[in-house]
Design a protein with these regions (language model features):
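Glycine-rich, acidic and aromatic/proline-enriched surface loops and short helix-turn segments
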Residues: 1-2, 22, 28-35, 43-63, ...
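Short, glycine/proline-biased beta-turn/loop segments that scaffold the active-site neighborhood
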Residues: 1-23, 97-110
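Short, mixed-charge, low-aromatic patches
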Residues: 1-12, 37-45, 84-90, 158-165
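Mid-domain, small-residue-enriched loop/turn segments at the edges of structured enzyme/sensor domains
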Residues: 6-15, 46-84, 100
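Short, charge-rich amphipathic segments
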Residues: 8-23, 63-69, 133-146
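Second-shell loop/turn segments in exported
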Residues: 11-17, 25-27, 36-42, 67-73, ...
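A penicillin-recognizing enzyme superfamily signal
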Residues: 28-32, 78-169
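Short glycine-/small-residue-rich flexible loop motifs, especially phosphate/cofactor-binding loops
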Residues: 39, 51, 154
């Protein structure tokens, strides 16, 4: 149970009661979409630190409310922002900002201007490794395991979840 910004107690609900009351790993919690694990982490952090972390991953939405329920993900993030944020996991902690134009040429092929992607280290390599292990567990043993029924054997990770009010990223 966490205390909200208004002083009220708040506890998340889970869709199931798997391993209710047991000690579980963060890996198991993420793989099985266990909201209590997320709430536990929020108790160790705080909503303001989480908002700063979200922004460091390239999410530009300045209207993200620093509330305890943010640990479950209830904020608007565009698909582009989500893809940009996940580049840090594929690039050993370096977030690569999206870049759609790399150069501009005139009608004779002369380069007028070039552009390079902005890169920023947002997470340590050791944290990236741990996160990738957990994201792979979602697909290999957790709530995303059904994707393997389609014969997909590629190394991949994921994060499943639910939504309210048709707000999907």
């Amino acid at each position: 149970t966490l205390i909200t910004e208004t002083g009220e107690p708040w506890s998340p609900r889970n869709a199931n009661k798997k391993r209710y009351g047991e000690m579980v790993t963060l890996k198991w919690g993420l793989a099985n979409s266990d909201n209590w694990i997320s709430a536990y982490l929020m108790g160790k952090l705080n909503p303001y630190e989480l908002v700063r972390l979200i922004h460091s991953f390239g999410v530009r939405n300045k209207a993200i409310d620093p509330v305890v329920s943010l640990c479950l993900g209830p904020c608007e993030i565009s698909v582009g922002e989500m893809v940009s944020a996940y580049t840090a996991f594929a690039n050993k902690g370096i977030r690569v900002a999206p870049l759609f134009v790399t150069r501009i040429e005139d009608n004779e092929g002369n380069v007028i201007s070039t552009f390079a992607p902005q890169m920023e280290e947002v997470i340590s390599v050791s944290s990236v490794y741990k996160m990738l292990v957990m994201l792979r567990a979602v697909i290999n043993e957790g709530t995303g395991a059904r994707v393997r029924r389609y014969g997909i054997t590629a190394d991949m990770g994921g994060k499943t979840g639910t939504t309210n009010d048709n707000s999907d990223s």
